[in-house]
Amino acid sequence: MVVSHEVDDRGLAELRRPRNDLVSEVAVGRDRFTLDHGPFHSWERTLQVDGGRDGTHRVVETITYRTAVAVWRPLFALPLRWAVRARRVPWWAPPDRLDARATRVLCLLACVQVVDGYLGTVITQTITFASDEFGRGDAAQGVTLAVVRLGIVVALGVVALADRRGRRRLLVATALAAVAATALGALSPGLWFLGSTQLLARGLTMGVGILIGVFAAEELPRGSRAYGVSVLALCAALGAGMAVWVLPVADLDPRGWRAVYVVPVVAIPGLVAVGRRLPESLRYTANIGSEQAVLNGNIGGRRKVEGYRLLMLAVASFLLLVFAAPASQFQNDFLKDHRGYSAAGITLFTLLTTTPAASGSSWLAGGPTPVADGVWGPSACWAARCSWWSATTPREPLCGPQQWLARRWAR
């Protein structure tokens, strides 16, 4: 990138000062600067100064850099170019300046998170169509979805192994196994087989999601962990949205829903590539051989505080899922059987209602105020309010505009 400036002596002095914004520079000559710290693999900035007679200087600034955002480079190419030219930290940047390693790890985890988000959505989006093909009713759907939830046991096993085998290797292996188990569901001869494969696949998918969060927390600076979680949440929403995008194939044939389970197979080469490029977690590497020192330390008080926080988060999650899980699982069945929606209509309705919510929640997670503050009161209040509204308020007044648009455009 080449930028021309017409500056006075003060402006020239500013250009000759090492940058400390999106990137931190170090001077290696009078008018040459290289990378000290920042989300770049390489960075070099040079100045060519031509003095004028009236006290002005014509400066040609040449900047060459290679970002560490991996496969997301096309998405960040233009915003990064603007930020580099403006010489300030952009609004979308994390609170802490990330180095090349942290940036690369976050971007690679985001790739896996997209796949994980897709895998975690297929059963809730397709079970109503699968039930129609197999001639089963709502009761069978409920039993199948309840059995699938038992996959949490598989997720706990995955997380336990991660403390012994390492994060990177288990993360990639679990993601590949989840894709294979999901694809196996496309061969289902009955609802029982689909539920069995999804019990394993959803358990592995939950394990992948937990490992991604742990990996990100261990790699990112303390002040940017909420930012990292929000970015990963957006990627999970993108993956879930992709499953919704594919759903209209169910309108083409009664067995068309099976295609949703086959699509993740195309992600296998990408997951293998991520496994080759993703380094092991810094904290896991640092903790190897230091377990005894930790056990011998006086950490009883810390464990008590962490246990209390864990309990608060568990209660908040339980109260949220008591409402959210049944709503998400039976929403498609309600829209298709009771409101007459096609698969394309369900897709449009889901996109219109969930995209703003996902964007807003991720923005809040990356904001300056921790979302978990006061988790006891707000969580209980919101869970009670949502449950009350779902029980006493008709669905049409709340979602009328979205339903009207979906039915008008998708039929």
Where are these regions (language model features)?
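Cytoplasmic helix-loop-helix junction between adjacent transmembrane helices
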Residues: 197-234
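Symmetry-related core transmembrane helices of the 12-TM Major Facilitator Superfamily/SLC fold
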Residues: 257-276
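Paired small-residue
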Residues: 181, 192-201, 397-405
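Glycine-rich segments within core transmembrane alpha-helices of 12-TM secondary carriers
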Residues: 224-252, 267
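Structural signature of the two symmetry-related core transmembrane helices
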Residues: 169-184, 374-389
